[in-house]
Amino acid sequence: MKMERLQKAMAEAGVASRRASEKLIVEGHVKVNGKLVTELGTKVSSSDQVTVDGVPLEREQPEYYLLNKPRGVITSAHDEHGRKTVVDILKEGGVTARIYPVGRLDYDTTGVLLLTNDGALANKLMHPSFKIEKTYVAKVKGLISNHDLEPVSYTHLR
């Protein structure tokens, strides 16, 4: 039976990012088979019963969605100011899985965005240690001066 680190299992189940899962473990929110676990690196298998604050960890089937994010929508699962989020859009379309965006696009930006409940994939795509190259295409109105481009690193422009 395959064993994996508890924080990885939690991230893959969509509980939180790996780092946030580590914090939950250390702070005493996680039990494995009814026993409180506060040590990072604890290994679990698919047959272990994991709970976070008493809620069983559900190992969901991975789901992946591509959304053409419209302008005026927040790239987040929740917004404390009540603005519409990318997750709201998918829920309106019938998606019931606990999903979250991979990366972000600004409020006034449109573009394709990946949303998933696959924490392992999200981590591989977003964590700098994996060195995943990302390409952005920007369409601007008017001319861009050299002064406007100064904050952008020319070494990353093509």
Show which residues each predicted segment covers.
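S4-like RNA-binding module at protein N-termini
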Residues: 1-80
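N-terminal accessory regions of nucleic-acid-interacting proteins
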Residues: 122-148
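Glycine/acidic-rich beta-strand-loop module
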Residues: 93-128
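Conserved small/polar residues in nucleotide/adenosyl-binding loops
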Residues: 155-158
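Anionic-ligand binding region
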Residues: 152
